[in-house]
């Protein structure tokens, strides 16, 4: 079905109603049916209408294939109630329609509903207001600028409608104009946001994306200026990568094929080349995904449920969930059987299904911390957060555990003051910052060195700086002037008073990682005694009353340990899950359909980047993907594999926030790993978006017939009575003359019958007969001359009979 996309905005349900009813009345097959020994034409049965309308809704781009047959029956009942269809006796106004062979037909009246002329007050920050200055470009002819009075008479309303129609006609006269470059860029931005909202299934993008950050010219450039491999081609070469960086990246990506052995090489040559590339990207003024889009990409990961939970804790939490909610899976199909009294609600439910918000599903969106502190946070806070993430968390897996990737702040029990949950996706480490006192107490208990002699290890390699922060090649914080040491039993400490953030929260939780887990440039081998001691310290069977902040800190440590369990040691902690000896006991919660959603959403989000950043991201992802898959690549680090090194090195130069306190290194690492696995799909040009823009531009530039040039209705011209009599006689005589000629020229008619018909004609129309045969000669000539004397009889010779002799 050739349909247009109904954009989210005012009167969307009315537009959907007009769209569906228009196609239903125009294309629904009508035929002859028999019922109760009678035949009825131009009608259809209820079952035929349900089958045809169901297929129509499934193929329509506004609804999709998720429309059920029961929803189609509800829509047909609304059609019967609103007089879109009626039964054979002309009855309508009720919803008494079943899936049977009852006959229905279309009435003569049009079911199209008029759209109110007054637009609502738009929010200044809403997505629909982004291209507000080009409102006339996407304006429908049914919209009216003038609002009629509520209590006006019928005549005044008709006059008002005529004035509005004339005004729309004047506006349509200059409508098929040439679109400017700015208009086409606005179309690119508008359609991109529509597809992104449809992919995520959110009612609005306000909680995910700031409309002021959208630059349609970037989207258009990234879609149109590409090479045959899909890489952005920059017209301004000043923003491109330097030639020496491109040469180094090409050398590493094609190692050892592209390595010219004629040049002087030495041991560790590939490490120096890699360090050169890493130095360039880590010294960029901002990350490749830019600071302003940090929230966008993190929210995409959170909305899609991109969290991993180990099996050791998963069983306990799942049992806990089942005891509180014994049958949560039955609530998924409530919308299929839900009855809508409002036609608008029914149409909008067909467009997109959003499950009802429930208090039992809070833990799926907020993770483990929310489960332990659910009683201390008000209901409205959870409702606000669930509005953005609730549907995708439940859609990912019912009864499973979400990840603790939100920044939740709780207060002490004795104060009774509850802090507000932040709407944005924030750092796991930010939780520790919000309760710094108790976190330091927890860290001092966890990281307390033993009485044994500590072993010192100085970071000797030169750190690579990113902005104002010191970074090692592995991407973890390490300052030149800080001396790290490790105790023999596995504890951590520092000579400086304040612990580095990656050490204080991240590195203290490496007890469950493999033996080759990297921490900066130091290789740490966790001992069995440390693991046993930390498991005992974090034992969930501790029933002693503790302070609320300490409870939050203990849950934080457990959650961060669980998330880091499969991120650092394994080569890939993403879907599809990989079996690795270092990542045993982990289970991925990202379902296959949500993985596809994440790929499509990130594909559109990467189009919002500046062209220079998108090109650098494409080349970087190609390089690190080839390096991680290259078996001939020498080891670039003594303590970790190539893939882990790529992720830890370039995670901060790909995704980073302006404020260090909000940086979530775990999500950044997972995003880079996800980009490595799916960079060919994410960073390619979406063909469907380009087709949608071209179709919309052609729709706006199509030639139109001006209103009023061709009359829509034709009326008979009034004539006088004399002219009517003259026309009546002339037309009648001409027809009678034609009848006479047919009798005369009919050769198949016998002469006797022809004479009989001519006599009858002469008796009825003597004047016309006289004009055709003025004399008897002309009449005789018609039959020809025939002799009146009979021919003499033939003389037959009589036979002679012989006499009979006796």
UniProtKB/Swiss-Prot annotation:
Protein keywords: GTPase activation
GO CC term, one of those recorded: nucleus
Sequence intervals crossing the membrane: none
Ranges annotated as biased composition (Basic and acidic residues): 167-177
Single GO MF descriptor: GTPase activator activity
Chain intervals for the UniProt region annotation (Disordered): 142-177, 564-588
InterPro entries: DEP_dom (IPR000591), Rho_GTPase_activation_prot (IPR008936), WH-like_DNA-bd_sf (IPR036388), WH_DNA-bd_sf (IPR036390)
One Pfam family per UniProt: DEP
UniProt protein name: DEP domain-containing protein 1A
UniProt organism field: Xenopus laevis (African clawed frog)
